[in-house]
Structures are given as C-alpha cells and as structure tokens.
Amino acid sequence: AYTMDGSQIGELEYENFNAAGATITFKGKSVHPGYAKGKMINSMLIANAFINDLPKNETPQETSGYEGFFHVHHLKGSIEETVLELIIRDFDQAKFEERKTLIHTIAQKFNDQFAAQFGEDIVIAEVKDQYYNMRQKVEPMKFIVDLAEKAMKELDIQPLIKPIRGGTDGSRLSYMGLPCPNIFAGGHNFHGKYEYVPVESMQKAVEVIIKIAQLTATTKFNPN
C-alpha cells in the first residue's frame, strides 16, 4: 500500500520521524505580590526556565535533514498553574529515547530545587509516544519502494527518495502489518496559510499510481 501525502513531484519516502508528545504541568504558589518575597512561586517563570533548559539549536526552525527537535507549540498559565505542550521528533530510535528522558530529567531538576519550599513535585511531565519511523517495517519489504521508483522512471519522473520530516498514516499502517511508503501529491507550504497544490502535480501523482497498478499486474515479486 501507499499513501499519497508527499510534496513535490517525484518524492518517494519510507522514513519518518519517531514521534512523542509531552504535556508538562507546573505548579505555583500565589500570594500578595507586595509581600511575596520568599513565598511566591510563579509557575509561568518556572515554565520559561524549563523551556530555556531545552537545547537551543534543536527546534524546528534550526534543524533539517535527519536532525531531530523539540517543538513547544502551546503554553497557557497563571501564577498557580501553567501547562506547556511540546512535541518530540527524531529519526534515530536511541536519540528519540534520549530526548524523552531529557524531559523527565529537567522536570526532576526543578522538583529537587523547590522540594523544601513547595513540599511536593512542582513539575509533572507526561510523555506519550505517537508514532514511529516506518523504515523498520518497510525495508524488509523494500520491493514496494522499488516498484514505485520504477513506475516514476517509466513516466520520466526523477524519484526523490528522502526522509519525511513529519509523519503519515502510512507509519501507523506499517506498524499494523501493512508496509506503506509515501508518494508525492504535489502539496507545498504544509500547515501554513500559504498551503497550495498545483493541479499538474496531482495529475502526475495519478499517473504514478496507475503505473504502479499496471506494474503490479505484470511483475513477479520476491519479498525476500
């Protein structure tokens, strides 16, 4: 199977991020600001310090290729409670695990710092996996990638094989037992107000999936 969720003409992808989401809750203590010395704990300032403890150069705007990142995408708070939401992304499984561990390590740092003053954990970090790199499931069935590549070449389309800096439904399907690489659909500027797709690119995508169907009917496959 294939998903049609790629960008420019020729894109063919069978690697994607390992992904997790984190929700971090910061607890504070509110008192009159005029008499707050040594008493007030401002949860918003602790959240800010937490963000500053994340690697500065490992954000979406500072990374590319196979580089992973932390992405803070939501922050809402008051003195007594602040909730921060971020996503964690990495292609490498070991580095992915290290990133998740770092979230808990930073949380524990602040819990230790405020233990005497607050009396309980001041930072509560919840990290949940979202999806995984499909490469592990697709490579043993690499012929499905080769088939799509052959289809493109027969249509004079230059295959652009590269990692997806995101995820697709194909990642979930791959881990459900249906290896599912991704083929271009022509979209550009995803997740922004300038997102668009040329009709000509969609037409090329249709030609590719028709050619894949034709080749499937006439090709003998050896999964091994």
Where in this protein do the model-derived segments appear?
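Metal-dependent amide/peptide-bond hydrolase catalytic core
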Residues: 44-224
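Fold-level recognition of mixed alpha/beta catalytic cores in primary-metabolism enzymes, strongest
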Residues: 1-43
